[in-house]
Amino acid sequence: MPRGQKSKLRAREKRRQARAKNAQEKEASPGPFYGCPHQASPVASMPTSPNMPMGEQSTFSHSYTSTSDQNLDEKSSDDSEDTEDWCKDPINHKVVLLVQFLMEKYQKKEVITKADMLKYVIKTSKNHFNEILKRASEHMELAFGIDLKEVDPNRHCYALFNKLEHTFDGVMGEEKMPSSGLLMIVLGVIFMNDNCVSETEIWNVLSMMGVYANRKHFIYGDPKKVITEDMVQLKYLEYQQVPNSNPPSFEFTWGPRACAEISKMKILEFWAKIHDTTPDSFPTLYEAALKDEEERAQARAVARAHTAAMASPYSRATVCSSSHTNI
């Protein structure tokens, strides 16, 4: 074979090998959006509150204690390593990719189909599709308060729904994923701390989930702004300076809108589900949630009675007016 032809064949073979290598890397590595984010730690790592009764605290999968800044840095480093190890598992990695894929579809208001999930995310892991989808759905529900539901079984089309009765799209804008999950976590921490918690403790808890005050989050955007400004303006949270604190420190309580729209039982059910248990596994918190349910029922009864009392004179006046007209 002529030397020139051999050179062409060698060059062609090198190009073929390079293309094959690039294809393998593309399959193994996610695109710029579907990377394994630092924040995508397992939902099971969500911590308990330091002020939760000890008997109840031990029921949760991971205990939590207040730490110094140095310990927080060490904890952040450990969590980062745990996250990397967790993401190295092929199935876990696909779960993270699918969660991000679903969120991008949500933001673009595009139809979610099984075919697209298989084509763009699952790829060679088709045999594990059901497991990956189930775990991704659980992650979105527990971490973000979002339900994934199949809305067209024939075409295998899915849609995302906010678990709360009232959506929180206004918190981050219509183009972002609702942050109801973040709100429920913050409300839960407040509930577990006798209905008032320091800002420091809130960030200690959220940092264990990969949510930091000074770091952009791939779902929540600017978490500090969402919690200390947006949710406060929407009256889901109250954020105020601790009296006589020097340097100034701040604390959170439930806002009037949260008190009106979200029951403590709903929050406790949310946290219990995170830790794969039931609300009555935490007797003290469960008792407080039951008391809240009773107070809500009484308030509704009083409101109904008041409405009926206001309507009664109007009804009598209407009857009298009709009688005079007939005469």
Swiss-Prot record:
The keyword Cytoplasm applies. It comes from the Eukaryota. The keyword Lipoprotein does not apply. Keywords: Cytoplasm, Tumor antigen, Ubl conjugation pathway. InterPro entries: MAGE, MAGE_N, MAGE_WH1, MAGE_WH2, MHD_dom. Residues 46-70 have a biased composition (Polar residues). Expressed in testis, stomach, large intestine, small intestine, spleen, lymph node, bone marrow lymphocytes and blood T-lymphocytes. Not detected in brain, heart, lung, liver or kidney (at protein level). One of its GO terms (cellular component) is cytoplasm. Gene3D superfamilies: MAGE homology domain, winged helix WH1 motif, MAGE homology domain, winged helix WH2 motif. Residues 91-289 form the MAGE domain. It is found in: Cytoplasm. Pfam families: MAGE (PF01454). Residues 1-19 have a biased composition (Basic residues). Residues 1-85 are annotated as: Disordered. Interacts with LNX1. May enhance ubiquitin ligase activity of RING-type zinc finger-containing E3 ubiquitin-protein ligases. Proposed to act through recruitment and/or stabilization of the Ubl-conjugating enzyme (E2) at the E3:substrate complex. This is Melanoma-associated antigen B18. The gene is Mageb18.
